């Protein structure tokens, strides 16, 4: 977990890039995803190619940090938690229930909205992070527990 509150500036794209770099991301990043591939296979869900590409870029980044809003003294906790969740190398046992839920009837709802095959990848966001799926064409679909709409990125 990154506990320091760091000021970020610029437009939204610039801010997101700064946050991702602070969490360990860099241009051209490619990491070993064998732990994640095994996790998916153990749950009977072989990773799609787009899921593999996404994970090679983003798996293993710091999954919890604070996002400074208007004042550095107050900051929202931000999650970038991809399955399997590893916080300081320790597995979060709630993830199996989340993965199961996101692979069942919720997945059917996402695939219907997307019109293509999708896979769950985890939770991303702050306060109430969204459940996030990736489509076979690389689009991200997010659903929050407090709204009915499915968002596409």
Question: Predicted regions span which residues?
Answer:
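Compact, glycine/acidic-enriched structural inserts
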Residues: 145-153
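A surface-exposed partner-binding patch
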Residues: 1-128
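Short active-site-adjacent structural elements
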Residues: 129-132, 151
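Short hydrophobic/aromatic-rich beta-strand segments that constitute the beta-sheet cores
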Residues: 140-143
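Short acidic-glycine loop/turn motifs at beta-strand connectors
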Residues: 134-137
């Amino acid at each position: 977990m990154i506990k320091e509150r760091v000021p970020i500036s610029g437009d939204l794209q610039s801010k997101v890039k700064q946050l991702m770099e602070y969490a360990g991301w860099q241009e051209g990043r490619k990491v070993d995803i064998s732990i994640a591939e095994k996790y998916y296979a153990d749950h009977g869900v072989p990773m799609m190619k787009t899921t593999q590409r996404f994970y090679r870029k983003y798996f293993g980044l710091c999954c919890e940090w604070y996002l400074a809003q208007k004042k550095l003294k107050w900051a929202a906790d931000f999650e970038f938690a991809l399955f399997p969740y590893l916080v300081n190398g320790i597995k979060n046992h709630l993830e199996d229930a989340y993965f199961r839920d996101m692979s069942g009837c919720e997945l059917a709802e996402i695939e219907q909205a997307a019109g293509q095959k999708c896979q769950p990848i985890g939770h991303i966001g702050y306060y109430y992070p969204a459940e996030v799926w990736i489509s076979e064409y690389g689009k991200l679909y997010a659903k929050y527990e407090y709204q009915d709409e499915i968002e596409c990125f």
